[in-house]
Structure formats: C-alpha cells, structure tokens
Amino acid sequence: MRILYWGTPAYAVPTLRQLHQAGHTIVGVVSQPDRRRGRGQQLVASAVKQEALNLNLPVFTPERIKKDSDCQAQLAALKADASVVVAFGQILPLEVLEQPPLGCWNGHGSLLPRWRGAAPIQWSILDGDAETGVGVMAMEEGLDTGPVLLERRLSIGLQDNAHALAEKLSGLTAELMVEAMPLIEAVGAGPTDERLHRLGVQHQAEASCYARMLCKQDYQIDWSNSALAIHRQVMGLYPGAQTSWNGKRLKLTQTEPLIDRLKDQLSPEAQELVGQWPTGGHAGGTVLACIQDLGLVVSSSGCPLLIREAQLEGKSRSRGQALVQQMAAAEQQSIGDN
C-alpha cells in the first residue's frame, strides 16, 4: 500500500518503522514543525521526523495543516492509498480526511470510547482504570469518534507509570496497525459507509470521558488527598508530579500506597510497613518515618504513602538511603504546603 504517515512524538516512531519494514510504500511523512528545546533553545526535529529522515522519506512540517492549502495540495499529489495517523498533534480537516481512497486510520492510545482527547494514557492511570489498550479507528471530523476496526487490551498495574505504559502501548499500536493494513487494502476503495460496513467496524457508544490536556496545576500534589490518589498522580504524570521541601521543588517518581487491600500489589518491603501507622492524627504531608534503605513514609488522607524515589530541585534523582540523606529529613517535618 501507498501510505501517508502522520505522527510527531517518540510514541509514533514504532508504527512508522514497522509499516516501512512490512513493505508498504511510505509516500510521505507529516510531522509537527521543529521546536526550540533545552537550555540552549536549539531547534529540534520531532522524533518521527528524525526517523523519517533516517529512512530517506520525504517530510512535511506544516504549522497548521488546516490552513495550509499548499501543503494539502502537495500531499494530495502523493496519491496515497491511505493515511495512518498516530499522535500527530493537529486535527485534520475534512478535505484532508477525504483525500485517500482507502481512508484515514488513527492509532489511538486508549480504549474507545472510554478516553477521547489529548492525554488518554495519563488519564487512564489518574482515574484508576484497571485496563487500557489501543485501537485502530476510522477517522472522521469528530475528535476520536470514528468506528473501531481493531483493538487490543492491556492491564494497568499499580506500579505502571505513564512512560512505561506508553512504551507498551506504542508497540501494540505498531503491531495492530500492521495487522490492519491488509484488511483495509482487501476491502478496496468505494463509498466510506460501504467500505466500513465490509470491514465490520464497531461503532462507538456515545458515553465517553474527555482526556483533556494536562496543565501545571495537575502536577501539584495535594497532601490532603488519599495515598492512592497521590500515587496515581505520581504514576500518571511521571516524572512530573511535584511537591515542595524546605522551599525547593521535590518531584516524586516512585511511591507505594501503604493500603491493606492493595497489599498483594506492593513490594515485599512495603508490605511489611502496612498497618504500622494509625490512620488520622497527622496533617497531610507529615513525615512519619525515615527508613534508610527504603525512603520516607508520609501521611496523607487515610493510609500513608511510601516515597521510594524523588528528585530534589538542583539534585539528581535519588532513592532509598540516598534520598533520606539528600533531603536530611526527620520525623514530624512537613512536605508541601499543606
């Protein structure tokens, strides 16, 4: 098949690579423009653009594809059979969606219609979902509303953070998209409704949650929340959930909620700590214990939270004994502003 590929972050690289390895002709790659990053504010190409250049593929980087009629015309001239979109970062206008005769297909990083929107991986963890997955969806004008052709499910473990989960889902997306292409090609061109009917796609239910873009406030830990809610925040926003310690920013990167009903999902070391501190009696964010080989036990609403790894502003990430020493923490001190 002649495929026009749309994608931007590292998440989208495996799908491009595997479609290319499967023998499909990638007629072009569309990605977000180079952005300034880092302390030196150097222009840096997206991960997908870098991969495309490594594969000697033509690259297009429109600032806004919806308003760039010249780019739209260039892409139409490539005569792609189908478009494949994975985390591109812009909404495609109808005139672009209607170009390829075999349709535009999106690799979506969640189970639909559970999470639609910009940050489904993060919100699936934040909301405590037991499972997530990926889907290959026929694109239409609505945001993530199209019918689903294929889907794969994946359990979310208590210690799965957003980065680790994204890596798993990225690989699944690539596998699923490679599986989908022969099905799409076999059905051939024709009116959209007829093509989708022959493919046997599953139309989505109306009920869904919107995985909105994350904002600065989402990353700030509130120690009046439960240990489980804070843990999900640390995992879902990895590595960015933060609090403060003696006026400096403290990013939490690994925690364990010391909750009896979750005991079988905790590490052996954390299991031994469950139930050692009575609930209540301490303000949220109070250091209850400094355990040299594990980290800090901190109070929250209900059961306490074990901080196993964190990064203090101006320091490298540390864990266990090194973390306790770096923070010079003592019992009854307070973390955060609560």
Swiss-Prot record:
Keyword Transferase (UniProt): yes
Binding site for (6S)-5,6,7,8-tetrahydrofolate: S110, L111, L112, P113
Keyword Secreted: no
Taxonomy, superkingdom: Bacteria
Protein keywords: Protein biosynthesis, Transferase
Signal peptide (from-to): none
GO molecular function: methionyl-tRNA formyltransferase activity
Catalytic EC class: transferase
Gene Ontology CC annotation, any one: cytosol
EC number: 2.1.2.9
Catalytic activity: L-methionyl-tRNA(fMet) + (6R)-10-formyltetrahydrofolate = N-formyl-L-methionyl-tRNA(fMet) + (6S)-5,6,7,8-tetrahydrofolate + H(+)
Role this protein plays: Attaches a formyl group to the free amino group of methionyl-tRNA(fMet). The formyl group appears to play a dual role in the initiator identity of N-formylmethionyl-tRNA by promoting its recognition by IF2 and preventing the misappropriation of this tRNA by the elongation apparatus.
Similarity comment: family membership: Belongs to the Fmt family.
PANTHER family the UniProt entry points to: METHIONYL-TRNA FORMYLTRANSFERASE (PTHR11138), METHIONYL-TRNA FORMYLTRANSFERASE, MITOCHONDRIAL (PTHR11138:SF5)
Name under which the protein is recorded: Methionyl-tRNA formyltransferase
Species for this entry: Parasynechococcus marenigrum (strain WH8102)
Organism phylogeny: Bacteria, Bacillati, Cyanobacteriota, Cyanophyceae, Synechococcales
